[in-house]
Amino acid sequence: MPSFLRGILRPKERHHENKNHSQMSSDSLTSSYPTSPPKLEKTEAGSIISSTTQKKTSHHANLTITTKTEQSQRRPKIIDQVRRVESLGEQVSQKQRHMLESLINKVYTGPLGEELVQTLYLRIWAMKETPESTKILQMREDIRDQYLRMKTERWLRTLIRGKKTKLRDFQKRYEEVHPYLMMERVEQIIMEEAWKLAAHIVQE
């Protein structure tokens, strides 16, 4: 074949070969990486997301219902316990007040009161003389007894103040009035006797 024909034919052959090669490469790439239509992917993804969201929402709703049910079951028990404790506190406080009033009534009317005023009279008579002790010893007996009962009642109400009183409460109140008692020996004697009468109430 003449050389000039070879020069003409070779570019055409190369162009044809390149075209075939590029087509084959394209086909091989297409066959190697199969893809789905974009719309189908989006649709499938959307359905998957929607399904997952529904599952999560349903699960969350179930948890919420369960939690509310548990809370509703617990709440009555907690409320009952609180009410029971409060009612016990009220009962104890009422009992203590009732015991206090009953004790004061005995101080004025019963044999306990008679024994109390005799004890106070003897202790005041035996103590070192003070203006207050002298005044009490010079009183007429019935007036003196009533006076000592009233003093005792005042100390009882000071020691037992309505609400539940414990031993530490009495100790605190005693510390508050201690300086006064050191100057008023008669008051200290009456307070001590009042405490002896009220000790069983404080310990309830």
From Swiss-Prot:
Asked whether the keyword Amino-acid biosynthesis is assigned, the reply is no
Q: Name one GO biological process term.
A: symbiont-mediated suppression of host JAK-STAT cascade via inhibition of STAT2 activity
Keyword Signal assigned: no
Residues spanning the membrane: none
What cystine pairs are annotated?
A: none
Give the protein's recorded name. Answer: Protein C
Keywords (A to Z) from UniProt: Host-virus interaction, Inhibition of host innate immune response by virus, Inhibition of host interferon signaling pathway by virus, Inhibition of host STAT1 by virus, Inhibition of host STAT2 by virus, Interferon antiviral system evasion, Viral immunoevasion
Q: Which organism is it from?
A: Human parainfluenza 1 virus (strain CI-14/83)
List the biased-composition ranges (Low complexity): 25-34
Q: Where is the composition biased (Polar residues)?
A: 60-70
Record field: compositional bias (Basic and acidic residues): 10-20
- Give the similarity note: Belongs to the respirovirus protein C family.
Q: Which domain of life is it from?
A: Viruses
**Segments of this protein annotated with the region Disordered:** 1-75
